[in-house]
């Protein structure tokens, strides 16, 4: 029976950070359990190939229940299933979110998670190509830089955005977020730089860190109100128990972590009994508060041939393999913009992802021609969903619903975002290169037609959060401000599921920050990152 001081469940964006930081102490034994396998696929390494991982063994391949406000369709929810987790399959976009996001966390019962508290942890993790500054760090494990070989038409997208009235800003991860600028990316020398690359692989040579892949967790071991270990299966072997002398740390993500809690009898007792799980600890908030960013693309065929069309040709593969440059270094979305679509908003309600590609149906639909996509993303959705068990079998995927577009204001923002996308495409230097609008198409004109198109084509942009809400005071909270599960000892949740409210932007960088700060909380070193930054 394996044992350790800390047993970490999930080698994703948070689990890799925890494994590295906790094993820095040679006297501490750390066991990391990962359901997936190694991250050796070429589709992990090549930035532009990330959609090739969808619906493969590298993907948990979830989908929602029929969504009541999106024509009853099931929405695809990919999640990484290998070392690095979703940081090994995402679009590598480094976006922290806005200071007001974290100050809101603090106001909602999470002291110590305001912007001034979390900024030092962002800086600690970074090795930013821009150099050290008030907002950025160097020397950290996470490589952050600019696009290595941006598409020529990406500059046109940026300049057209400015012509449409969106100011150009130097750094959306700096003092001002509203505006347009190139995306910053998790890459090193033209290849993906995941949490596994940054944190786990450098630590795997340590004798006090053990990593077990192919380990599907069945549930937690409880002794009264204390969690003492984890039950898991590896391959065809029988159930094994990993004992934790100090703590179990759940880092299985916003879908996996609540599923494990529920399978362990931690949640709403009535709902647990319905699927044959014996209740062990009442915590009704488990699985509630699910949030994600809905999006869709305005897509235009263009005359410029410097796009990602036919990027998988041998010559482009050779350029990436030999020089780590060219089309395949693209993250598909190369230009970012945060905008407020109407007066009176406290912050941007739409984030644009813009790139030189036809991106529809999560990249699974193709088009024979050169295209650009201008995709409005709903930054602060008001909809709240949930995750719950399908059955008591750990191998059964959980059920989930996001309730996307339940709030009319969310739909209003996306309609405005689609109109602004068209306005950007109508500005030079882009307008003269646009051949025609493909999506939603020129026949879609008035608000009702745009709303219908949005409901038909809406996607989720791979940012599920919130299902183990952090708060010292909220009634539906699952963990406190130190990420300890309410009412239990020896158990914390450390991943995107603890976010009380989704951040205004991509969620991978915030998840790594959460784990950096959690490592200090666990080690009793809170404030260490602030002291390091001041040194």
Which sequence ranges carry the predicted segments?
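N-terminal redox-cofactor-binding region of secreted/periplasmic oxidoreductases
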Residues: 1-535
């Amino acid at each position: 029976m394996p044992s350790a001081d800390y047993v970490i469940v999930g080698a994703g964006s948070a689990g890799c950070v925890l494994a590295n930081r906790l094993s820095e102490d040679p006297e501490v034994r750390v066991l990391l359990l990962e359901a997936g396998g190694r991250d050796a696929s070429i589709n992990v390494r090549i930035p532009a190939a990330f959609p090739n991982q969808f619906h493969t063994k590298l993907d948990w391949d979830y989908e929602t229940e029929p969504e009541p406000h999106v024509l009853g369709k099931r929405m695809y929810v990919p999640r990484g299933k290998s070392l690095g987790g979703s940081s090994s399959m995402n679009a590598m976009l480094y976006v922290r979110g806005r200071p007001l996001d974290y100050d809101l966390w603090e106001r909602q019962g999470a002291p110590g998670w305001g912007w001034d508290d979390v900024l030092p942890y962002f800086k600690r993790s970074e090795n930013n190509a821009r150099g050290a500054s008030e907002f950025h760090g160097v020397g950290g494990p996470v490589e952050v830089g600019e696009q290595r070989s941006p598409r020529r038409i990406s500059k046109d997208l940026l300049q057209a955005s400015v012509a449409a009235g969106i100011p150009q800003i130097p750094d959306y991860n700096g003092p001002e977020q509203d505006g347009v600028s190139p995306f910053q990316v998790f890459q090193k020398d033209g290849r993906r730089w995941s949490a596994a690359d940054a944190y786990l692989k450098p630590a795997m040579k340590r004798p006090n860190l053990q990593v077990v892949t192919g380990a599907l967790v069945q549930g937690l071991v409880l002794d009264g109100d204390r969690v003492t270990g984890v039950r898991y299966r590896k391959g065809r072997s029988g159930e094994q128990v990993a004992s934790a002398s100090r703590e179990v740390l759940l880092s299985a993500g916003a879908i996996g972590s609540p599923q494990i809690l529920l399978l362990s009898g931690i949640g709403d007792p009535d709902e647990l009994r319905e699927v044959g799980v014996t209740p062990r600890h009442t915590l009704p908030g488990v699985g509630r508060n699910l949030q994600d960013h809905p999006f869709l693309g305005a897509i235009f065929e263009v005359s410029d041939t410097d796009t990602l069309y036919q990027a998988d040709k041998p010559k482009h593969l050779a350029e990436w393999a030999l020089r780590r440059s060219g089309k395949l270094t693209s993250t598909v979305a190369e230009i970012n913009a945060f905008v407020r679509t109407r007066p009176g908003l406290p912050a941007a309600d739409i984030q644009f992802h813009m790139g030189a590609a036809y991106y529809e149906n999560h990249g699974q639909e193709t088009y024979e021609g050169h295209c650009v996509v201008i995709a409005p993303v709903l930054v602060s959705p008001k909809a709240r969903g949930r995750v719950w068990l399908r059955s008591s079998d750990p191998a059964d995927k959980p059920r989930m619903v996001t309730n996307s577009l339940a709030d009319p204001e969310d739909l209003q923002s996306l309609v405005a975002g689609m109109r602004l996308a068209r306005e950007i495409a109508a500005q030079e230097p882009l307008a003269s290169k646009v051949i025609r609008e493909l999506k939603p198409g020129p026949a879609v004109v008035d608000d009702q037609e745009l709303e219908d198109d949005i409901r038909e084509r809406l996607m989720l942009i791979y940012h599920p959060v919130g299902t183990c809400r952090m708060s010292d005071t909220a009634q539906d909270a699952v963990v406190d401000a130190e990420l300890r599960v309410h009412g239990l000892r020896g158990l914390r949740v450390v991943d995107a599921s603890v976010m009380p409210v989704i951040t205004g932007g991509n969620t991978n960088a915030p998840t790594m920050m959460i784990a950096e700060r959690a490592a200090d909380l666990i080690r009793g070193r809170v404030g260490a990152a602030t002291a390091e930054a001041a040194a």
